[in-house]
Amino acid sequence: MPGCRISACGPGAQEGTAEPGSPPPPPREPLPSLQPPSPSPTSTPTPTKSPPLPEAAETPVEGQELQRWRQGASGGSGGAGPAGIAGAAAGAGGRALELAEARRRLLEVEGRRRLVSELESRVLQLHRVFLAAELRLAHRAESLSRLSGGVAQAELYLAAHGSRLKKGARRGRRGRPPALLASALGLGSCVPWGAGRLRRGQGPEPDSPFRRSPPRGPASPQR
């Protein structure tokens, strides 16, 4: 209402002034306090532990380092641009040079090993040749020693029997005695047909018992 006082229009005035015949107002409930409740010692919250991570989620140290290296290489190449590409090309070129140098050294070592093996084989061949030559020389020396021994024995024999050999050679040079020739010619007169041969042309030859008779045929007259 206009013109009324605040004290008369407030809630206190309304409570104090009640209409006659109306029931008494119900008791009002106290308003809840807005202050937070005091913490009790028994209701202190305990710190909760986080559940342990599974072993599969833990990555090894080497894997982490590899990932970091890959990330750094990709980031450096992506961020650097042409400079990163040039650095990578230079690194690849350096590695290629190192590989070429290692290959050259390996080829040199292989060539030296082959040369050494060839020299060893040649030395073995020369050793075999020298051994065969020594064996041949030993055989020849043995044969020469045998020949020299035979010559020495022949010289000794000649020195011991030289006079006898000279006498035998002188005796062999003499001619046959005439008595042997006469006896050989005289044998022809011992047989009856031998004398006829010596006196050919002087008379008929006597009949020889060893002369063959002519064949007897059916028409030949019998004596």
Swiss-Prot record:
- Record's keyword terms, sorted: Cell cycle, Developmental protein, DNA-binding, Neurogenesis, Nucleus, Transcription, Transcription regulation, Ubl conjugation
Q: Where in the cell is it found?
A: Nucleus
Bias (Gly residues) occurs at 73-84
Q: Which domain of life is it from?
A: Eukaryota
Which tissues does it occur in? Expressed in brain and kidney (at protein level). Also detected in spleen and intestine.
**Which terms does the UniProt entry file under GO BP?**
cerebellar cortex morphogenesis; neural precursor cell proliferation; regulation of cell cycle; regulation of cell population proliferation
Summarize what the UniProt record says about post-translational modification. Ubiquitinated, leading to its degradation by the proteasome.
Principal subcellular localisation of the protein = nucleus
Q: Region Disordered: which residues?
A: 1-84, 196-223
Function according to Swiss-Prot or TrEMBL: DNA-binding factor that regulates the expression of a subset of genes and plays a key role in tangential, radial, and lateral expansion of the brain neocortex. Regulates neural stem cells proliferation and the production of intermediate neural progenitors and basal radial glial cells affecting the process of cerebral cortex gyrification. May control the proliferation rate of cells by regulating their progression through key cell-cycle transition points.
| UniProt protein name | TMF-regulated nuclear protein 1
Q: Which organism is it from?
A: Mus musculus
